[in-house]
């Protein structure tokens, strides 16, 4: 089906949740999880609010998924230097935004002094050599890669949970250990689609 190739799969429920959450979310949520020290869990609440989905972790940290029609909305030109999937971290003193190109932008400008200390230590998400080195080192050490299957699994489950909150248009509460929605048969029924006989999950 030509509608499913060359980018045509975007916006299709079967492949992209109809809201690009499974596309852009897959590229960005793992970075948010890592920054929150939450690689082994995921948000516990997902609430659609206008054009965003507000997620909350058990530790109180909020994650806001931006579901604008264009991935980055109407942002200034500097966003292009951050790559295709920028993520913004907002704190008490301002914000830091970075993306898969390794570029970093901060506000207020006074944070740029601290940025100089960080930029020498960072590793770009698009740096193939860094990813390859991490993989080869882990082959030798038998250790886990930085973006291992469990890290990515939790990120993807969070994307799917957010997509279901979006589709149902209501707040969902997720038990991250059981990986099921609390007290919500309808949402739980959407976690896995019925398979054609004789296939089962």
Annotated model-derived regions:
Residues 28-31, 131, 135, 155-159:
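Alpha-helical packing segments of well-folded alpha/beta enzyme cores
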Residues 56-58, 137-201:
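C-terminal helix-rich "cap/oligomerization" subdomain common to oxidoreductases
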Residues 48-51, 58-129:
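NAD(P)-dinucleotide binding in Rossmann-like oxidoreductases
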Residues 14-22, 75, 117-125, 139-152:
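Active-site rim elements
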Residues 5-10, 107-113, 136-141:
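Substrate-binding rim/cap in mid-to-C-terminal beta-strand-loop elements of soluble/periplasmic
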Residues 31-37, 134-138, 164:
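Residue-level signal for well-ordered alpha-helical scaffold segments within enzymatic catalytic domains
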């Amino acid at each position: 089906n030509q509608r499913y190739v060359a980018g045509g799969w975007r916006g299709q429920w079967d492949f992209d949740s109809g809201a690009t959450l499974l596309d852009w979310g897959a590229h960005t949520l793992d970075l948010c999880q890592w920054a929150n020290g939450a690689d082994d869990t995921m948000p516990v609440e997902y609430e659609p609010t206008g054009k965003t989905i507000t997620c909350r972790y058990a530790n109180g940290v909020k994650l806001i998924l931006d579901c604008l029609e264009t991935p980055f909305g109407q942002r200034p030109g500097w966003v292009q230097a951050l790559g295709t999937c920028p993520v913004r971290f907002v704190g008490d003193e301002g914000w830091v935004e970075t993306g898969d190109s390794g570029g970093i932008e901060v506000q207020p400008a006074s944070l740029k002094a601290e940025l100089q200390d960080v930029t020498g230590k960072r590793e770009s998400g698009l740096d193939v050599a860094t990813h390859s080195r991490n993989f080869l080192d882990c082959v030798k050490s038998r250790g886990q890669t930085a973006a291992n299957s469990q890290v990515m699994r939790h990120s993807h489950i969070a994307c799917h949970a957010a997509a279901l909150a979006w589709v149902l248009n209501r707040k969902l509460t997720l038990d991250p250990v059981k990986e099921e929605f609390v007290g919500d048969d309808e949402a739980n029924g959407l976690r896995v689609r019925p398979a054609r006989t004789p296939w089962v999950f």
